[in-house]
Amino acid sequence: ILDNAISIPDEISIGVVSVPTGLNFSSQIKKVKTLNQHANMKFTFSNPDYSGLVDKFEWANSALIFAYDYKNKVNISNLTNTGYGQIARFAQQDFYLPLKKNIKKFEDLFNDLNIRNETFIDNPNHYDRSLFEKSGMGWQGKSTMMLTPGIGPWQLLGTIYVEINFQPTEERSFSCGECNLCQISCPTGALDNCLLYTSPS
């Protein structure tokens, strides 16, 4: 269905996970909220029972996980000019726009074929990291960021649940190993004391 119908740029990677997965992150999210370690953030924390639930739809048989690599889409001078404030790559423009544009191609195809689907992009009702590791696309680093070899953390995620059975991508094992430079370098210690639910020990 997809190979002959949709063209996507090299910056978009796609992984596939079979559902149901049995995964549920609700208790972790609620624990962080109870301990007041979420810095009063409402995103994801507003409805943990639903946002942390991976198997949201009984009709779904697959989840397509999209990652948009934006590391080469920025003005590097904004990061390297001395004497000026540095603007984070993520903040230089709305990188969700190309991600949404390409995911919509899949939505439109599924809808045209009357294939049931549901999309989550930057949505507080879905913990979008939950399927990233299982898809084999990368891992959750000690920096709390989702990392992919050759890309690093400069990517945005989206998910489509779909009723079709797609062949899942291979689940692979990644880790930071003994490296903890991000935790050592963090000036406030936030990587150890704040977003613990996103950072492996």
Q: What does each model-identified segment do?
A:
Residues I1-S175:
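Auxiliary alpha/beta "docking" domains used to position bulky ligands
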Residues Y197-S201:
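Conserved small/polar residues in nucleotide/adenosyl-binding loops
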